[in-house]
Amino acid sequence: MTKFRPLHDRVVVRRLEGEQKTAGGIIIPDTAQEKPMEGEVVAVGPGARNEQGQIVALDVKAGDRVLFGKWSGTEVKIDGEELLIMKESDIMGVVTA
């Protein structure tokens, strides 16, 4: 992957694949599937500046599995891969195993 470094408090997220089947075994076609709201953090910016001008580091890091809002982020294509760029505040939480 091309080296891409987000600025400020922005985060690059790769969507994780959604379910292809319902609980009853019905296969959902791609056109009817909702976009997943879960993804893996690929890269993070250095952080936002506070009122004193100091950089405040982000709470998420590359490799974290996160949940975000349905309409969060801007879709971009880097090296042919569909990714999302969003602010850290668009992330609702980190999923832990």
Curated annotation (Swiss-Prot):
InterPro entries: Chaperonin_GroES, Chaperonin_GroES_sf, Chaprnonin_Cpn10_CS, GroES-like_sf. One of its GO terms (biological process) is chaperone cofactor-dependent protein refolding. GO terms for cellular component: cytoplasm. GO terms for molecular function: ATP binding; metal ion binding; protein folding chaperone; protein-folding chaperone binding; unfolded protein binding. Keywords: Chaperone, Cytoplasm. It comes from the Bacteria. It is found in: Cytoplasm. Together with the chaperonin GroEL, plays an essential role in assisting protein folding. The GroEL-GroES system forms a nano-cage that allows encapsulation of the non-native substrate proteins and provides a physical environment optimized to promote and accelerate protein folding. GroES binds to the apical surface of the GroEL ring, thereby capping the opening of the GroEL channel. Belongs to the GroES chaperonin family. This is Co-chaperonin GroES. The lineage of its organism: Bacteria, Pseudomonadati, Pseudomonadota, Alphaproteobacteria, Acetobacterales. The gene is groES.
